[in-house]
């Protein structure tokens, strides 16, 4: 068993192309949900999302899928934060690994290639771009690209777990270090799914938010709020550098947080719904707590999944109420999707990276667009404005369509 530390974080969201600008905007209570630009969304009932604007891809990746570009850029930021260079990774040999997930792969590139196939009318020729399929569409493309650019020779994984993908990826990375299979892991997830197909598909599922009557798209996604109607699709990436204690000591690194424990589980209730008793979610939370050797009163903040859908926010809130021991103070709860949208496969790792920053800065980020709870979401301590606090332990929960449940407890190093 080996301790696992976070030494670097990187994030790209609709509020900024790095962690600093994203943090600053969320701290001020801003939301990055606006009308979609540059994409033909005629025919879509929902035409707004958390779109990353003004993004410049890393050199050499100008033609890559947008999700791959996000992943590579966020890894570069995480490495800068950790004060790591490519030579540091190469010296580790097979001790450096990559675990970068995707909920669906390069869907924008796939759509572009399919459009070419339909309209070019030339079939498979020497000049057709179809050869790009295998280098840009499979879910593992981001992991492959990062490992190739940095010449990493250790293990390489691409978890796929719907909207829990980012958190599951970090857990898989922590397991590699904990089991002694790696000394350092670049991990997280990226997602770029702002496209009419996904806007339409999620709309038909009934999970996309409607414009708020007063605030429009900016106020559409309202976690735990009485007026919640669903989420807004976001895009971007969240990446973390995980290291063993030995690796941190050897290179005189600076830990930002310790990954204290984790737990995985599933809710078999259906594709999108949660068990109304919240028992499956509560079981995973309690398992993570037991593995950490902590009590519910030790958790200072919960970074919630909170998609702002009617039933799932209610079940999640119930899990948090049941989680708190009788007589204990309830932990603060923050939900970030009102600010950065639902980044789908990247949601967990982006929100986890922001949770690491909360520990480092000793500050709790606010829940954008939460005005008042209803009967189903009352009884939890939702943070509406940024506030300083003495933080020791943060619980991050992620849920995914199909029943995926993942939890990580972060502690001060």
Could you describe each region identified by the protein language model?
Residues 1, 34-73, 105-172, 181, ...:
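Conserved catalytic cysteine-centered active-site region
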Residues 1-60, 82, 102, 246-258, ...:
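ACP-dependent fatty acid/polyketide chain-elongation machinery
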Residues 1-6, 86-93, 292, 296-298, ...:
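Flexible, low-complexity linker/loop segments at domain and module junctions
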Residues 3-7, 30-35, 213-292, 300-301, ...:
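Condensing-enzyme catalytic core mediating Claisen C-C bond formation in acyl metabolism
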Residues 8, 26, 75, 98, ...:
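Conserved small-residue
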Residues 71-83, 139-142, 150, 156-190, ...:
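Active-site-proximal alpha-helical scaffold in enzymes
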Residues 77-96, 149, 248-254, 284-301, ...:
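Phosphate/pyrophosphate-binding loops at sites that engage ATP/ADP/AMP, CoA/4′-phosphopantetheine
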Residues 181-229, 262-276, 306-313, 330-380:
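Acyl-CoA/ACP chain-elongation machinery
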């Amino acid at each position: 068993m080996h301790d696992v530390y976070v030494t670097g974080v990187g994030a790209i969201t609709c509020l900024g192309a790095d962690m600093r600008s994203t943090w600053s905007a969320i701290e001020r209570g801003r939301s990055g949900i606006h009308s979609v630009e540059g994409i033909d969304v005629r025919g879509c009932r929902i035409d707004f999302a958390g779109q990353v604007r003004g993004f410049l891809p890393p050199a050499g990746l100008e033609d890559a899928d947008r999700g791959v570009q996000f992943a590579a850029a966020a890894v570069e930021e995480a490495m800068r934060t950790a004060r790591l260079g490519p030579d540091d990774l190469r010296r580790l040999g097979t001790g450096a690994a990559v675990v970068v997930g995707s909920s669906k792969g390069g869907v924008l590139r796939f759509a572009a290639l399919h459009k070419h196939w339909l309209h070019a009318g030339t079939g498979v020729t020497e000049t057709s771009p179809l050869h790009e399929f295998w280098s840009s569409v499979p879910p593992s493309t981001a992991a492959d690209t990062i490992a190739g650019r940095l010449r990493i020779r250790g293990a390489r994984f691409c978890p796929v777990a719907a909207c829990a993908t980012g958190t599951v990826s970090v857990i898989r990375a922590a397991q590699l270090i904990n089991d002694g299979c790696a000394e350092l892991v670049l991990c997280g997830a990226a997602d770029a799914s702002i496209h009419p197909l996904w806007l339409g598909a999620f709309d038909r599922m009934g999970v996309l938010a409607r414009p708020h009557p007063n605030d429009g798209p900016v106020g559409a996604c309202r976690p735990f709020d009485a007026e919640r109607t669903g989420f807004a699709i976001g895009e971007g990436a969240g990446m973390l550098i995980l290291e063993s204690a030995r690796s941190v000591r050897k290179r005189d690194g600076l830990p930002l947080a310790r990954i204290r424990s984790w737990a995985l589980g599933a809710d078999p209730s259906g594709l999108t719904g949660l068990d109304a008793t919240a028992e499956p979610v509560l079981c995973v939370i309690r398992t993570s707590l037991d593995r950490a050797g902590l009590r519910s009163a030790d958790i200072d903040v919960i970074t919630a999944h909170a998609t702002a859908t009617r039933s799932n926010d209610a079940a999640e809130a119930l899990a948090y109420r049941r989680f708190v021991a009788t007589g204990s103070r309830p932990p603060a709860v923050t939900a970030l999707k009102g600010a950065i949208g639902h980044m789908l496969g990247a949601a967990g790792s982006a929100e986890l990276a922001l949770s690491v920053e909360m520990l480092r800065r000793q500050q709790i980020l606010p829940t954008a667009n939460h005005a008042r709870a209803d009967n189903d979401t009352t009884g939890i301590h939702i943070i509406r404005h940024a506030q300083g606090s003495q933080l020791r332990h943060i619980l991050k929960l992620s849920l995914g369509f199909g029943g995926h449940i993942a939890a990580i407890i972060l502690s001060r190093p």
